[in-house]
């Protein structure tokens, strides 16, 4: 959530899902630790902002993205999340169907991809420190 700029978009999505229960929207500003803690308790995250999607992936929370930028598409594909559609043309029925499908499916691919990304990040870190020590 880019607070307060995204509140209007959240209200629009909420109007699509008004008959659904157990769906909550964050409508306040949070620091990084609070945000990670909140997301870690989610059963599912529907988001547009890259940082929210990254936090969901890190916390092993199934993520669905509404894309507004190629960087979101790239991250979702890399992380094994689900792209629900584009902000320019997503429809209510499409969003609800994707949400319902994701709700019933564990994020196996997402978790596998995140483990691969963690391993690659660790390898890059080790190589960086080796270079700094003059070992490579």
PLM segments and residue spans:
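Active-site anion-handling motifs in enzyme catalytic cores
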Residues: 1-136
